[in-house]
Amino acid sequence: MAEFKGTREAFAHAIINMAKTDDRIMFVSPDSLKAMRATTFAELYPEQYVETGIAEQAAVDVAAGLASCGLVPFVGTYAGFLTMRACEQMRTFVAYPNLNVKFVGINAGLLGGEREGVTHQFYEDVGILSNIPNFTILTPADGPQTYHAVKAAAEISGPVYVRAGSGREVEVYDKETPFTMDGIRILKEYGDDTLLLSSGFVLDRVLRAADLLKEEGIHVTVGDVNIINAEDPSKVLEAMGKVKRIVTVEDHNIHGGLGAYISKLAVENDPKPIKRIGLTTFGESGPAAELADYYGFSGEAIAKAVKENL
């Protein structure tokens, strides 16, 4: 596998590799070619690249048309520009007819807006799409998982949203680990005091919290939840059933994302105490690591929240 760094480059490498053997793969760019690190794709496969300019709604409509002809289009740009500006088109012209369009939203989460701040920090995207039927929502944790998530998206029938970041993500997975369609991967099993669930680009911090807690005699299990509102949540429910309580951590608003998904599963299947860690307000500009610490995503802050929930 070629070398890449971060979720954006991972996306570009994935569609290039797929296009080598599948001429149905298309990239529709609403003036996002450079942002998606996909310039090489356009050079290698000019007939599989469509540029709409700064027109997200038009890009989604074009992709819907391509999908209706049997092609597999990917629309990639900033997460908020997709899910907010083009929400109606994603709903009515893709999800309603259940067309095979794939969306990749970059700069998702608080940590994506290091330079731009609130206008380029998108922590509502999963919540928005969670309300639209037929969407599969994939939330890979880092670059390697994004690469495999994009390839997995191409194999899923119907609309798929892949949540990607800014390129500053800390790599947790090696490049060979596939994207599991079970909806969860257990990474540490120290004990059943708490199930510590992560979604997206805070996984490295969640793993640190687990190690800090272990040093204090608190033994948790860590799970990476990589599909939100999975059609078959049986593996997630299995993990939930083995512990006394749950803490969720997500680089997203606590409404509509991982915390809401797990709370719904618990209420309907196995009620138990749940603590949700995520955003409850708008973000701000600043270095990604400092923002993560300030908004409660440090390993120490997560460990403290777990202890308070015991």
Where are these regions (language model features)?
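Thiamine diphosphate
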Residues: M1-R163, R168-E169, P178, G299-A301, ...
